[in-house]
């Protein structure tokens, strides 16, 4: 071998140190369980998100709903063409009342988790203007597509009646 021994040792042992020599059995089992049920979970995510978007589009405190399944513009046409099994679990909307109404909405949620990540089986909500984008000026925030009252939801697989009830309560108290 013409490679320096230090490189060979590092290439072999750093990966083992950081990642382990193999996947633990419990982790392998959980990955298999997750893969076997991913289609069921994604269908539930998509179904719930479509119902939430429809609910939000009819609520008097909501000024705009951002969901591919509702869009009648060019993006909506592309979504209808390419997303045959559903439009995903993400749904955004804007409230009347500005930044304060967005924060009050989040504060009044009971079932939704207030976190910045997406893709969980649980329903998640975030108000970017007071969290992930709070360091930006109002102009910069708008330039990134985030209005002061914008709320982003990642809709989970809970029962749709529970999801809509929690959203309705939070909207009524925002």
Task: For each feature predicted by the language model, list its residue ranges.
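PLP-dependent enzyme catalytic core of the Aspartate aminotransferase-like
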Residues: 41, 107, 123-174
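Active-site C-terminal subdomain of aminotransferase-like
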Residues: 1-90, 94-122
